[in-house]
Amino acid sequence: MAKLSTEELLDAFKELTLLELSEFVKQFEETFGVTAAAPVAVAAAPAAGGAGGEAPAAEEQDEFDVILESVGDKKIQVIKEVRALTSLGLKEAKDLVDGAPKPVLEKVAKEAADKAKAALEGAGATVTVK
């Protein structure tokens, strides 16, 4: 049998119906002794067990929330930083700052979360990254 390229395999899969693809997956799992659901279960386990094992969850976490805990005495600077970090208007940014503790950014990369934390703390706010 000639070796098929990835593109040729994808083209062949595109021509199959969902029922045929489902049967293929079952046969593939039986032939190679693997399960298509295993990677999903492994990826979901750290998220579900995050409360129990804090250290392992922190190592594997790739999305972070930046939470404004308190404003401090430089409220205007904090509002300016919130507007710079988000696409919020003046009123929305002021409402967010007034309602602290509130999330400023959600599900961002570690680098973005650290930059946001540094910027907000530089403006006088107290911030946590979760």
UniProtKB/Swiss-Prot annotation:
Keywords: Ribonucleoprotein, Ribosomal protein
Superkingdom of the source species: Bacteria
Organism, scientific name: Frankia casuarinae (strain DSM 45818 / CECT 9043 / HFP020203 / CcI3)
Family membership: Belongs to the bacterial ribosomal protein bL12 family.
Protein name, UniProt field: Large ribosomal subunit protein bL12
The keyword Ribonucleoprotein appears for this protein: yes
Disulfide bonds: none
GO CC entries: cytosolic large ribosomal subunit
Designated gene of the protein: rplL
InterPro entries per UniProt: Ribosomal_bL12, Ribosomal_bL12_C, Ribosomal_bL12_C/ClpS-like, Ribosomal_bL12_oligo, Ribosomal_bL12_oligo_N_sf
